[in-house]
Amino acid sequence: MTKSIVRPMSYRQTIKPVRNRMRKFDYHSVLTAASNYLIETDAHGADRERAARLPWVAERIAVWALRDEPSMYRHAKMSQNDLRACINQAWNGIDASDVWRKSGHPLPLFMRQCLLAQVPHQQNRGMGAFARQIDLLSRLKSNSRLRQVIENHVGMRAEVYLQVAMFLWLKASVGIGDVFEPAYLETLTRAFGPGAMQSFWRTVITPRHVAGLALKDFDDDEWFQPNVLYRFPFVELHGRLYFWGAPCLHRHIEFAFSDIVANAKDKTAKQAFEDAFEAYTGESLRRSGFPVLDEDDVRRRFQVGGPCSDFMVIEDDATIVFEVKNKSLSLDLPASASVNKYKTKFKETLLKANTQLANVASHVRKVPEFVNKPIHRVIVTYGDLMLGRSDYLFPDEDQARDPVLILSIDELEQIVEAVLPGTTLADVDQLFRYCVWQHLIEIDMTRPIGPRCSITVLYVSTIYDSNSNEADFAQLSSQSGAGLDARH
């Protein structure tokens, strides 16, 4: 007797019974249940408590509902227990599906695939990425092409956008509903003007049919993506707003400018953004107290011809070369893919950076005093790509001698703090290895490497428009908790 072989189901096959189960309920109640579940999850302080609720699966429930037409749903009200049943069914179904059966992925990429969707719900929530946008604006002239691209997209002065966004950022984890109370909305409108507020709401609120159309095309990579709804932090249907939790809103706001630049396809604006980010990175490195060579310095000192790195730090025990790239997590970057696909995606960023760093390293090694010193090649990215060890991307023959590390600017700033004057760079290798280990083993960030900077009303005052109503602004600051202790 021949036994039939039961083949694992595909992603679409796996989620179909979950979607059928969801369709037994009223459409609004499904969206409400998912939204409330994510809001309640945000209120849990400990990351382990948040993780235990599988909030990233609840996000997928919302995505699948938004992809459906409301007419496909019935009339029973979905309870939180009903939602949990859908979450568990999806979790268990995916566990047994074929989405895990892609062979040949290096261990770091497999770990990334397993954990990437969970990370936003387990990270410490600092405001470093938000603060960098303020710093970026301070570097731009009023007629900058980059400023024009950003402001054309948001429909207001970029500083005003960040002012308004900060109040939502502060309310995202606890009290997001307060922002839409009539008194709060009235105060916002008085402070910033009705035109600015209308423009801002257009950037964060998306009609259901628009979100559904954008989500129409999908594959199994959807299951592994972080913040699948970051483009639509609020969705509107028949006058009701649905909110998908703090991680989605934070991601939307913190990377607003870099996303705008990436989608605009404007070479001048893109270059201006990269120049500003490069300058910011250089200033962060100089905080270490060690001499920092910029590209011109590196070319002169080591007679570098061809591709060159942005920065170099030289110490008695090590040489570190840095290349800065404006790259961060987004939906066009696969969460689960082959090495070759990642190489294609990173051809103009990470792989190009590696070529620049390798060329500099080869020139440095020609100088006798550097022959036996370790050279660390570091690619600094705008956001954390969570790629773990990078040898699968850069399998060049010098890999063992000159390891390549991909660090976000947040991680780099954490390292800079660790090597402030009084600490030698002899320990840098261990610090870099810690970052790699953090990605590979503890990507849930139980010991987060996060931004060192906090911004409160101090940063708000930096971008505050003096033409705004000061009394209204002070009222908003007190309502939003903008006067929190700077150690927060």
Locations of regions flagged by a protein language model:
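A short acidic/basic microdomain associated with nuclease active sites
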Residues: 286-307, 311-314
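Hydrophobic/aromatic beta-strand patches that form the interior of the parallel beta-sheet core
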Residues: 320-322, 378-380, 405
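Catalytic cores of nucleic-acid endonucleases
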Residues: 326-378
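Acidic, metal-dependent phosphodiester-chemistry machinery of nucleic-acid enzymes
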Residues: 1-275, 279, 283-288, 316, ...
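Extended, hydrophobic alpha-helical segments in both membrane/secreted and soluble proteins
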Residues: 281, 307-311, 322
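Active-site-proximal structural scaffolding
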Residues: 274, 278, 304, 315, ...
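Short acidic, S/G/P-rich loop/turn micro-motifs used as interaction or catalytic elements
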Residues: 328-329, 384-387
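Active-site beta-strand-loop-beta-strand hairpin of nuclease catalytic cores
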Residues: 313-333
